[in-house]
A protein has these predicted regions:
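Short alpha-helix in the alpha/beta-hydrolase fold that links the catalytic acid
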Residues: 198, 212-223
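Accessory cap/linker subdomain of secreted extracellular hydrolases
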Residues: 86-194
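Catalytic histidine neighborhood in serine/cysteine hydrolases
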Residues: 224-247
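Primarily recognizes the serine-hydrolase "nucleophile elbow" in alpha/beta-hydrolase
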Residues: 46-107
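Short beta-strand/loop motif that positions the catalytic acidic residue
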Residues: 196, 202-204
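Alpha/beta-hydrolase active-site loop
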Residues: 2, 30-50
């Protein structure tokens, strides 16, 4: 419950917090990241009608994909005075997923380095097909062709058999025909980040195996218009949920008692106090 911890902490410090965590399940199935951004805009519109909120500095805090939502809104809406990202994304989804494949496989120790390299290269081939296709049907056609070709070749290792199994193909097809996933494969964070005119705090975990904190913070720094209030932090021994961790593996998330590191809350508050005073 990291969002509860953040909301509670900031509320106690005098900040008005509105949590916008998830769409209802039935709506989410047909929604994309841009729909989530439109939802934020509707919330901002409702704030503008409230005399107790309309004149206050307004910002967005997004975790993981939520950072993409914050970037989209901040790029197009001048009402956004600051953005905070946790485990934030500046890379394309293809690059994020390739990092995940490599990092999680490496942490598990179940594959040899050569097998891990094969898994990454095979995944890259598939992700490139989706990202470069002009429609889900076009992507599905090319993926079917790829799997048909592979089924006619000699499979020489377990990793090849796993990557090109019918179960894996079914997973890929679910991604292709998911409006959310397909849209993410065609989303370019750089385009939106370059248009942001507000300060950003980007906080990532050193052992985040889902989003590479060092790489994405460097891209944020490169893409954002210059602002002395920008701040980029990598928290030592922290995972994607910014918990203190051992390996960073998603398997650890549910067994770590800590909800969110206290130093992350301190960084957020300290930066916010500075950002809203300017």
């Amino acid at each position: 419950k990291p969002f509860l911890a953040i909301a509670d902490h900031l509320t106690r410090q005098g900040y008005a917090v509105f949590r916008y965590d998830d769409f209802p399940t039935a709506v989410f199935a047909k929604s994309t990241t841009y729909d989530f951004a439109d939802g934020v805009t509707m919330i901002l519109d409702s704030f503008a009608k409230r005399p107790d909120l309309g004149s206050l500095p307004t910002g967005l805090l997004g975790h993981s994909e939520g950072s993409l939502v914050a970037e989209i809104v901040a790029a197009r809406d001048k009402r956004i005075d600051f953005v905070i990202t946790l485990g934030g994304v500046a890379q394309t989804i293809s690059d994020v997923l390739l990092y995940q494949v490599h990092a999680i496989n490496e942490a598990s120790g179940e594959l040899t380095p050569e097998e891990n390299d094969y898994a990454v290269e095979a995944s890259k081939t598939i992700y490139d097909i989706i990202a470069k296709s002009k429609s889900p049907d076009a992507a599905a056609k090319k993926i079917n062709k790829l799997y048909s070709y592979q089924s006619g070749t000699l499979i020489t290792s377990k990793i090849e058999a796993d990557v090109f199994s019918q179960n894996k193909k079914a997973e890929i097809m679910q991604m292709v025909y998911s409006p959310w996933f397909y849209t993410l494969f065609h989303h370019q964070p750089k385009k939106h980040i370059k248009k942001m005119r507000c300060p950003m705090l980007a906080v990532g975990g050193e052992k985040d195996l889902q989003v590479d904190a060092v790489t994405n913070n460097a891209l944020f720094k490169a893409y954002l218009p210059k602002n002395p209030l920008h701040r980029f932090e990598v928290i030592p021994n922290a995972n994607h949920l910014l918990q203190t961790c051992t390996t960073g593996s998603p398997d650890e998330y549910g067994i770590i008692e800590e909800t969110l590191r206290g130093d992350v809350l301190e960084i957020i508050q300290e930066w916010l106090d500075s950002a809203v005073s300017h």
